[in-house]
Amino acid sequence: YVKNNAETVDLNIEKKNENADVQVEYDGKTYNDGKNIPVKVGKNYITVKSTVQGENGQTATLTYRVNVHRRAADKTYYNEAYRNQYHYSVKDGWGNDLNGLVKYKGTYHMFYQFYDDTKWGPMHWAHATSKDLIHWEEQPIALYPDANGAMFSGCIVADEKNTSGLFGDGNEGGLVALITADGNGQRIKVAYSTDEGKTWKKTNKIAADWSKDPLNNRDFRDPKVFRWENKWFMVIAGGPLRIYSSDNLTDWKCESTYADLHTECPDLYPIETKDGVKWVLSRGGRSYKVGDFKQVDGKWKFVADEAYTNSDGVMNFGKDSYAAMT
C-alpha cells in the first residue's frame, strides 16, 4: 500500500546473480532501474522479469508480479453511504479472524486476517492500534505470505521476561506471534517484534507441524497461547483439539489430544467463580465448555464438567460472529 499522494514508486531490486537481466514493466513501458514508476489510484500490477543465460546457451526467466495499491483520498473511505461508523472496519479489501489481541505498553493492538480484494485470498496479517478500544488507527501490513504459504490465523503474546531468548541476552522481551502457515500442510511459525509491534521478523523456527501431530490430522491451525503456572500453553485445532506446552515459546511438546472435540479458532481461559477458578473452552466463539485445566497422570488436560461432557453452552446466537479471541 502507498498513500494517496504517492504518484510514483521505486522498486528496490537486489540481484542475487550479477549476470541476471532484470526488466520492470508497467502499462506497456519498461523501467530498467525500477525507479519513478507511475501508479494510479487502486491496484497497479508491476511485472518484474529476471532472465539468466546458462553456459549451454539456454535461458531461464523468472517472472514476478508486484501489486502496488495506491489509496484513494482518506476522506472517501469512511463517508460511504453504508459504512459502519461504530465498529472497526478495513478501509478496503477483505478482513476476518482476529489474530492478535494484546495490550502492550499502554497500546491495544489488533491484528487480523486481510487480503487486498473483496474476496477471500492469500492471507496477510493486518494491524490496527488504539489507546481506548474505541478509536482505531490503521497500521502497515504486519505479515505477508512467504515460502511457507499464506499467513493464516494465530495469536500474539507479550514475552515480557524474554523467555523465548529472541530479544538478546537480557531479560527485556517484546511481542511474539505464533502464526499458521499453510503451504504443503499446516504448521505454526514464530515471529517477533522489537519495536512494540511496528515491524516483525519471522524466524526459521517451526513451533509445531501437522506431520508430527499425534492425531495425524492435516487440520492443524489457529494457535492460541496463554501463560499458566510459569509455563506457556497453546491450543491448536482447525479439526480436533490439541494442547501443547513450552518453556520458551519456540520449542513445544504435545500434552493432550481430543479426537472427538472439533473446532476452529479455539481459546482456553480461566474465570473466577464463587467456587474457585474454572476454565472456559471456546469453540470459535459460538459455543463453549466449562471445566478444569489440570495435570492428569503428568499431562496437562482440559477436563469438561459433567454438564458439558456431551453438550455445549451457547456463546452467541449470531453465526456471523465467529473466531472470538481473548
Predicted regions and their residues:
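Beta-rich interaction/scaffold domains
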Residues: 1-76
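Carbohydrate-active catalytic/glycan-binding domains of CAZyme proteins
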Residues: 69-326
